Amino acid sequence: MWFKNLKIYRLSAPWALNGDQLEECLARFAYQGGNNLEMQSLGWISPRENGLLAHTLNGQILLTLRAEKKLLPTTVVNQVAKARAQEIEEQQGYKPGRKQMKEIKERVTDELLPKAFSIYRDTRVWIDTVNHWLVIDAAASAKADEVIGLLAKTIDPLPLDNLYVEQSPAAAMTGWLAADEAPANFSIDQDTELRASGESRAAIRYVKHSIDVDDVRRHIQSGKQCTRLAMTWADRVSFVLTESLDVKRVAPLDVLKENPDAATQNDDEKFDSDMTLMTGEVAKLLAELVDSLGGEKRV
């Protein structure tokens, strides 16, 4: 249930859609399985096996975007097209021209697509209508952009803004390391990266290794800035903050994994319990993280 990598956005206006309205919007762009004539297709699927495209609980909304991509190598298309071209050459007495060859490849692609294997990738979206967050569980910006693109078509207008803070994460993290002191309710863990801003982009990394403060200060004095920093919030959630304000490798600590009711809960109850826990904890983490970066910047 827990999102691992957070791409963080702000809802720029109060959420106006009720459950039925949201479901209707999502249904227009639902994933259509079995469409064999597209190399790639996108659409919304149910986050659970209950058929609804949005799972809503106490103002928290969970969505899932499915991306399907057909595996049809160009070499295969070219081989089949070449064989077809030879047959046509024998029939008409001369080689197919460039335009005809293009048409042959298009026909071959259409014929092979229904037989091609597919790979699927699901990306989850959490909309917090109470605290006005929109969070995408994606490590890469391209995947987040894919979600935002379809979401903007699904909900028009989409009340969404990027998140801006007063102090850049790189400057803040560098300051925390130099002072050997994390902001209130946070602690610094053992993974970090410092990188030079010049052409060399020289970097020093600590990976699961105690951070030598004096060594780090020397690197900072030489012009390096912290670009990644592993931290723990409230002894409850560990994560890595990046210079681009992404939150990666999110993991609940043992204190949050203990659920005395788990043995008596059915699957639906367990899902809702996990969702309530994750959304509640991460919403508080994000609020305190933004505060530690000087607060939200209005642009």
Curated annotation (Swiss-Prot):
The disulfide bridges present are: none
GO CC, any one term: cytoplasm
Q: Which GO terms describe its molecular function?
A: double-stranded DNA binding
- Is Cytoplasm found in the keyword set? yes
Superkingdom, natural source: Bacteria
GO terms (BP aspect): DNA recombination; regulation of DNA recombination
Q: Which UniProt keywords apply?
A: Cytoplasm, DNA recombination
**Compartments it resides in:** Cytoplasm, Nucleoid
Which Pfam family is one of those matched by this entry?
Answer: RdgC
Question: What's its job?
Answer: May be involved in recombination.
- What family does this belong to? Belongs to the RdgC family.
* Name of the molecule in the record: Recombination-associated protein RdgC
What's the source species for this entry? Bordetella parapertussis (strain 12822 / ATCC BAA-587 / NCTC 13253)
Name of the gene: rdgC
